[in-house]
């Protein structure tokens, strides 16, 4: 209703001004500005909806002010371009319509009415309400109800008798199990759901709407609100260190806690969270690749669900045979947005909706089959009688190819329980949320019936029942929850540990690299993650007088303030103000100690603008002074005009990537010498090893042969045509996720380049 009202007010404002107001520059500018704000707000809302499926929420607040990288980002480029073009088109059309009757006499009354209608359209829009609530959540000091409802459970379970298997289904919300809406989509897992305790109204709250946030909510009974973006949690050394979570209680009660997933454990700090809260046995992509049958059978995120659940079954069987008390948590990935992935062992590889195949529905149908197969193995085993199986979604599905169909339904998270000791078949329609999951499980295992803000749905009352406005209530508690991190409020002295790649100050530890905004009463950490912008881009958003401490590889800050370190991959510390003075210090000891020293200098806006512009230079446009192309740092030598077909820098160098160009091309600003030696230090990937690799300059071609290990080869070239471009053509680029950023599409690797040097051989 609010959305319809806002649109009606918007159209009324346009019509009144266009047909009645007449000509006046000030009123035209004011009305166009407010109407333009309405357009921007709503396009922002729909763009956010595209990524999250939930409009402008806490999860996208960080992303809206930083670059989006990571999971399948290429699939969002086209929609992003469409949004920008639509915005330009709407503004142009709006200005043209408002000026239609500019030659008519001005009428103050109608101009005022049009402006008031425009302001009303903004105020009534859902986008404005969402942003207003988010801003309030950032500025509140907390909510007195937090102290009333936040409860710390006992740290152990007396006489535990049941093992626990907890399955997180990636985005596998309960809505998919509506057989009337989606016939025969989830028959295997749906049948198991109907055999157990099925909680049909599990809502999603702010701060619980992405994977690591859903895990924190379900185990600690709190949303993931932090002084940084939640998916950047990999940079912290401990995770809600003061909280007692489900894993802590299980460990104290004698459980061995296991976690198995197909993706890298470091992503979003899952390893930090789990290690901080009772899990000693963690298995992700790195740990599984040495034990799975086919290490190359992977999707963009890691190992497929059938592989992961097979490994989970092996763990369950071995642990059950050992007789020790255990919990086994596992997380699937095949249903990850935007499209999902199909395991090769599935019988259900295709699901049609609206008379055409739908990839997301197909991935759901396949994944639920794999989960059901895993559960049925447990049920058929002699150990089921001592086991509780929990199946839940980590969060509601984000914007995938099934999302518009899901939105037509009443959406809820999945949460059901199968008890081997005491079979119960019941659908419970009690209002609840994912923070109640851990407390419900703890209650069944014989512990307390509360964890944090979560309550057992079997014997307690959820916040979703207590508060009609539970989403607003949780947002109001955000400052209270952030305080649970116990983050430092000042930074004076700090220590960098090069062996551990950590920085420590005021009792806190963070992984490197790290950017910090330091004020009198607050230290704001800005880690680098798969979803955040590089730290230099984040620093470019600082105000001229903001104090910063930036710890990163030297070459990343060298182009600004230390050109002599342009090729150094050591750690450096920079501090200062973008509009004032900055220093760069080379970290030259294993345990390097430093102090903050911010000078109260006059702000130079010209210097500030220059620093910001330099920070925003993209990697491929960076240039440094060197007599060779060094591939483990960003950019290229000053002599290089442009290059293509080359992937990002890694610690050792860079791969060629046929996704970025069929050949490696390096174009120099000036013609290459008439006669020169080309010294190439490189290695080959996969089948490119020990095969002839053509290297061309102008009309002349030489052959390069590389092995799997790095070697140096010198090729001799004549260049009578004054060619300026070097071309290397790997013969068989291999599609692989080797060394890939989690969630990115596979690269097509050919050769790995460490250094290329042109040596003039003219006499």
Curated annotation (Swiss-Prot):
Q: Cellular location of this protein? A: Cell inner membrane
Q: Where are the transmembrane segments?
A: 1-21, 24-44, 77-97, 108-128
For molecular function, the Gene Ontology terms on record are:
phosphatidylglycerol-membrane-oligosaccharide glycerophosphotransferase activity
Pfam families per the UniProt record, alphabetical: DUF7024, Sulfatase
List GO terms (cellular component aspect). plasma membrane
Provide the reaction this enzyme catalyses.
a phosphatidylglycerol + a membrane-derived-oligosaccharide D-glucose = a 1,2-diacyl-sn-glycerol + a membrane-derived-oligosaccharide 6-(glycerophospho)-D-glucose
Q: Which InterPro entries match?
A: Alkaline_phosphatase_core_sf (IPR017850), DUF7024 (IPR054288), OpgB (IPR020881), OpgB/LTA_synthase_biosynth (IPR050448), Sulfatase_N (IPR000917)
Membrane topology designation: Multi-pass membrane protein
Kindly report, in one word, the top-level EC class recorded for this enzyme.
transferase
Q: Which HAMAP family match?
A: MdoB_OpgB
Q: In its UniProt entry, what is this protein called?
A: Phosphoglycerol transferase I
């Amino acid at each position: 209703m609010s959305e319809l009202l806002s649109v009606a007010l918007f159209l009324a404002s346009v019509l009144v001004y266009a047909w009645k107001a007449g000509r006046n520059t000030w009123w035209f500018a004011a009305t166009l500005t407010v109407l333009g704000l309405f357009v921007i707000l709503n396009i922002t809302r729909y763009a956010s909806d595209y990524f999250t499926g939930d409009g402008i929420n806490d999860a996208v607040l960080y992303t809206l002010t930083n670059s989006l990288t990571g999971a399948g980002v290429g699939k969002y480029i086209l929609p992003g371009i469409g949004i920008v073009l639509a915005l330009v088109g709407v503004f142009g059309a709006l200005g043209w319509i408002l000026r239609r009757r500019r030659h008519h006499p001005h009428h103050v009354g109608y101009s005022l009415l049009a402006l008031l209608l425009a302001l009303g359209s903004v105020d009534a829009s859902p986008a404005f309400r969402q942003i207003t609530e988010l801003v309030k959540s950032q500025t509140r000091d907390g909510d007195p109800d937090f102290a009333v409802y936040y409860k710390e459970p006992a740290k152990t379970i007396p006489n535990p008798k049941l093992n626990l298997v907890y399955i997180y289904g990636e985005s596998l919300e309960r809505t998919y199990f509506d057989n009337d809406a989606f016939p025969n989509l989830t028959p295997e897992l749906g049948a198991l759901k109907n055999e157990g305790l099925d909680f049909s109204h599990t809502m999603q709250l702010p701060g619980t709407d992405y994977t690591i946030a859903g895990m924190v909510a379900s185990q600690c009974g709190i949303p993931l609100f932090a002084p940084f973006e939640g998916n950047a949690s990999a940079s912290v050394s401990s995770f809600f260190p003061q909280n007692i979570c489900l894993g802590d209680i299980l460990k104290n009660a004698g459980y061995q806690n296991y976690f198995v997933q197909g993706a890298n454990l470091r992503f979003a700090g899952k390893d930090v969270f789990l290690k901080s809260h009772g899990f000693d046995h963690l298995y992700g992509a790195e740990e599984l690749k040495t034990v799975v049958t086919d290490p190359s059978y992977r999707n963009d995120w890691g190992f497929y669900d059938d592989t992961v659940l097979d490994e989970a079954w092996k763990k369950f069987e071995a642990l059950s045979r050992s007789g020790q008390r255990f919990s086994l948590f596992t997380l699937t990935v095949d249903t990850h947005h935007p499209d999902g992935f199909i395991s090769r062992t599935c019988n259900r590889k295709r699901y049609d909706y609206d008379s055409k195949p739908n990839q997301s529905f197909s991935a759901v149908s396949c994944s639920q089959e794999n989960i059901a197969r895993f559960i049925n193995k447990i049920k058929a085993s002699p150990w089921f009688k001592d086991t509780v199986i929990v199946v839940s979604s980590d969060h509601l599905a984000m914007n995938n190819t099934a999302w518009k169909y899901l939105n037509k339904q009443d959406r809820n998270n999945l949460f059901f329980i199968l008890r081997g000791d005491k079979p119960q078949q019941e659908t419970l329609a009690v209002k609840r949320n994912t923070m109640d999951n851990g407390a419900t499980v703890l209650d069944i295992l014989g512990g307390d019936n509360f964890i944090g803000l979560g309550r057992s749905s079997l014997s307690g009352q959820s916040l979703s029942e207590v508060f009609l406005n539970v989403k607003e209530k949780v947002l109001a508690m955000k400052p209270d929850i952030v305080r649970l991190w116990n983050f430092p409020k000042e930074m004076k002295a700090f220590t960098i540990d090069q062996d551990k790649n950590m920085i420590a100050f005021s009792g806190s530890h963070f992984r490197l690299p790290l950017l910090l905004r330091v004020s009198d009463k607050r230290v704001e950490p800005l880690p680098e993650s798969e979803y955040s912008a590089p730290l230099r881009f984040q620093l470019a958003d600082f105000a001229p007088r903001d104090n910063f401490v930036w710890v990163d590889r030297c070459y990343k800050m060298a182009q600004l303030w230390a050109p002599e370190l342009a090729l150094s991959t050591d750690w450096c510390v920079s501090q200062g103000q973008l509009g004032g003075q900055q220093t760069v210090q080379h970290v030259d000891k294993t345990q390097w100690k430093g102090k903050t020293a911010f000078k109260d200098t006059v702000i130079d806006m010209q210097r500030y603008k220059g620093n910001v512009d330099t920070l925003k230079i993209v990697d491929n446009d960076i240039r440094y002074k060197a007599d060779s192309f060094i591939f483990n740092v960003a950019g290229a030598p000053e002599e290089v005009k442009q290059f293509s077909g080359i992937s990002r820098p890694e610690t050792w160098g860079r791969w060629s990537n046929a996704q970025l160009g069929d050949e490696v091309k390096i174009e120099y600003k000036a013609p290459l010498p008439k006669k020169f030696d080309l010294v190439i230090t490189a290695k080959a990937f996969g089948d490119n090893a020990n095969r002839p690799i053509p290297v061309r300059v102008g009309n002349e071609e030489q052959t390069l042969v590389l092995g799997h290990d790095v070697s140096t080869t010198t090729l001799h070239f004549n260049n009578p045509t004054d060619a300026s471009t070097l071309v290397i053509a790997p013969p068989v680029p291999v599609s692989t996720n080797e060394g890939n950023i989690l969630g990115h599409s596979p690269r097509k690797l050919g050769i790995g380049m460490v250094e290329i040097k042109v040596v003039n051989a003219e006499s």
